[in-house]
Amino acid sequence: MHCSSPKMVCETKIVADEHEAIAGTKKDSIIVSSSQMWTSSSASPSALESKIEKRNQVFIREFERSDHEEVRRIFNEGIMERIPNSAFRGLKQQTTTQFMYAFLTVMCYVMTKSFTLTFCAPFILMGARYYYSRKVILSYLDCALHTDMADIEAYYMKPTGSCFWVAVLQGQVVGIVAAQSREDDNTVELRRMSVDSHFRGKGIAKALGRRVIEFAMLNNYSAVVLGTTAVKMAAHKLYESLGFRRVGETEDYTLPGMTRSPLERLFFQIRYSHYRLQLHEE
């Protein structure tokens, strides 16, 4: 059971529901009269369409050593997006924290009697949230870049039951995803999924997710599992569209690299959602 098993498809062309969203792949009707003829030097409409379609096809293939820099770039950019999302967007989901910040603002007025300072209090609190979100997420990124993302071949390509894929468009790596075996419960974990921000909305993430599911099915795993701290609902809808079911949540989750200091706990909170796609019963 290995990602380079001969029976497995190592390079897969995307066939996704969002196929029309990939620029240049939607074919327009062309009506040609019987009097129109193409010379040997002219390109027929079908040939032109075929050339455009081929240029815009996205392929999922196994990671190669030459992909390393692009993979790290995509992963790094995806993680950095979580800083403002966690600091500001995430607050909408944290009712208790909202009340706490409101209480601190009121106490600021009670203790100082200063309207100016009270007016500034919410901005100070948001600034502190951004600072600690950046601090925690940069620590998490550093941990990842010095563990599995430092040596993808050793962590994902060599071990039995694990693999790492990249999505390639026009010769450029535009997306990544990994699968890691969990032999204790015969499941595989979907990890490190990220798509270049310039190529989102084209069905690439869904195709990467399907590749992991296909890998799990071919290797007779009972389920695919994943965990996400994503704040944006689009990420959760993606997993649900692939058939995953949310099976639990961990409030106030501790990311690798966190110190759990009082100020860090006050200004950084994140929810960890657990998803599972059951493939077959044990």
Curated annotation (Swiss-Prot):
Which source organism? Answer: Danio rerio (Zebrafish)
Spell out the family assignment given in the record's similarity comment. Belongs to the NAT8 family.
Residue ranges occupied by any N-acetyltransferase domain in the UniProt entry: 110-269
**SUPFAM superfamilies, alphabetically?**
Acyl-CoA N-acyltransferases (Nat)
The identity of this protein, by name, is N-acetylaspartate synthetase
A GO cellular-component term linked to this record: mitochondrial membrane
- What EC number(s) are associated with this protein in UniProt? 2.3.1.17
The alphabetized UniProt keywords are: Acyltransferase, Cytoplasm, Endoplasmic reticulum, Membrane, Microsome, Mitochondrion, Transferase, Transmembrane, Transmembrane helix
**Which InterPro entries does the record associate with it?**
Acyl_CoA_acyltransferase, GNAT_dom, NAT_camello-type
What the entry lists under CDD domains is as follows: NAT_SF
Q: Which Pfam family, giving just one, matches this sequence? A: Acetyltransf_1
Where in the cell is the protein located? Cytoplasm; Microsome membrane; Mitochondrion membrane; Endoplasmic reticulum membrane
Molecular function, one GO term:
L-aspartate N-acetyltransferase activity
Protein's job: Catalyzes the synthesis of N-acetylaspartate acid (NAA) from L-aspartate and acetyl-CoA.
Instruction: Name where it mostly resides.
Output: cytoplasm
Listed under catalytic activity are:
L-aspartate + acetyl-CoA = N-acetyl-L-aspartate + CoA + H(+)
- Membrane-crossing residue ranges in chain numbering: 103-125
Q: Write down the membrane topology.
A: Single-pass membrane protein
